[in-house]
Structure formats: structure tokens, C-alpha cells
Swiss-Prot record:
Substrate binds at residues 49, 109, 113, 117, 177-179. FMN binds at residues 44-49, 59-60, 66, 91, 126-127, 171, 181. Belongs to the pyridoxamine 5'-phosphate oxidase family. Homodimer. This is Pyridoxine/pyridoxamine 5'-phosphate oxidase. The gene is pdxH. Transmembrane segments: none annotated.
């Protein structure tokens, strides 16, 4: 891990801790932007579940729209927006390649989830058409009956993705739109640079 990458990661960690201790309702909420095989972009909000020097991890159904996007075009952008921080909010953007996390990591995280969240992962065919809420409720009841009295295992089609950063951008909001921006970026040889940008 290079010094600049370590600096960017430490900056994120400090801001994330600040957000967790602030008025933010959900500091771990992040927008994940992906593109499908045709290059059509889409974005949605998910929760950050872990981060370290290897990257930023979230979990989902692998056959969801974002799961399919990431398996055919393994690049993503993350966006954190913490409006309550500092003078006028802080925004962090992270861009990078995407990898599936290991089965062991996915198993460990799935085992830590509330039981009804585990059941929901089995009952939901995420991003597919649903005829009615009653249909979903029936699927939930069926899964509950299937696993009554025993642990709920992780479904094969559910797991984690790790975004491996190739760029960080930190935006510090200020009055009169006189913001401050810093960008850390790796080149093709994984050499990191740091630049200040006009707001």
C-alpha cells in the first residue's frame, strides 16, 4: 500500500467515523453506480458493510441488476454524501474495479444478519417482476417453514462485491460554493497521485 493510498484511506476512515457520530441518519449509505453490457448506467443506494486496504464491500443478490452489471462490467463508482458534516457537507467519491468477495466472507456476514433478513434473501428474486405483495409474503412464509428450527444458510446466489479503489475524491462544502476538492488517483502502473481541483 503506497503512502498516498494509505493517506486517502485514512482520510475516508476519519470522515466516516465523523459521519457515524453526527446527525447523519445512515452514514454507511452510499450510491453505487454501474453500467450494463451496453454501457447503460444505473445507480442505487446500498449500505457499506466493510472497508480496509483491500477495498469497500457491500452485499446483494448476484442476479440482481447491479449484480449482473458488475459481473459483466466489473467497474463501479461509489458516492457518500454527508450533509451534516462541517460547514456545508462532505462528499466522497470512490471509483474502481470490482471483485467478488470470498465465499467465507459472504458466509460470515450472512450469518451475522437478523434472521428475517436472511429469510428475505431466500424469498426475494431481486429486480425480477413481482405480481403482488401477497406473492412475496407467501414466499417469505414458505422459506420460514423450510428453515423452521434451524439456521438459515446463505443462498448460492447471494454474496458480496469489493470495490478496489483506483480513485478517491474528497469534496468539502463551503459557503458561496467556494468548495475544496482533492483527488487521489492511481495510474496504469498503480502509482498514486494527489491533486487539488477547482470546485
Amino acid at each position: 500500500m503506497t503512502d498516498l493510498y494509505a493517506e486517502a484511506l485514512a482520510t475516508f476512515a476519519a470522515l466516516y467515523a465523523e459521519a457515524q457520530n453526527s446527525a447523519e441518519l445512515e452514514a454507511s449509505a452510499m450510491t453505487v453506480a454501474t453500467a450494463n453490457v451496453d454501457g447503460r448506467p444505473s445507480a442505487r443506494t446500498v449500505l457499506l458493510k466493510a472497508f480496509d486496504a483491500r477495498g469497500f464491500v457491500f452485499y446483494t443478490h448476484l442476479d440482481s441488476a447491479k449484480g449482473r452489471d458488475l459481473q459483466t462490467h466489473p467497474q463501479a463508482a461509489l458516492l457518500f454524501l454527508w450533509r451534516s458534516l462541517r460547514e456545508a457537507g462532505i462528499q466522497v467519491r470512490i471509483e474502481g474495479g470490482v471483485q467478488l468477495v470470498s465465499a467465507d466472507e459472504s458466509d460470515a456476514y450472512f450469518a451475522s444478519r437478523p434472521r428475517m433478513s436472511q429469510i428475505g434473501a431466500w424469498a426475494s428474486r431481486q429486480s425480477q417482476a413481482l405480481g403482488s405483495r401477497e406473492e412475496f409474503d407467501a414466499a417469505i412464509a414458505k422459506v420460514e417453514a423450510t428453515f423452521a428450527g434451524r439456521e438459515v444458510p446463505r443462498p448460492d446466489g447471494w454474496g458480496g462485491f469489493r470495490v478496489v479503489p483506483q480513485a478517491f475524491e474528497f469534496w468539502y462544502g463551503a459557503k458561496f460554493r467556494l468548495h475544496e476538492r482533492w483527488r487521489y488517483e492511481a495510474d496504469a502502473a498503480s502509482h498514486w497521485s494527489k491533486r487539488m481541483l477547482y470546485p
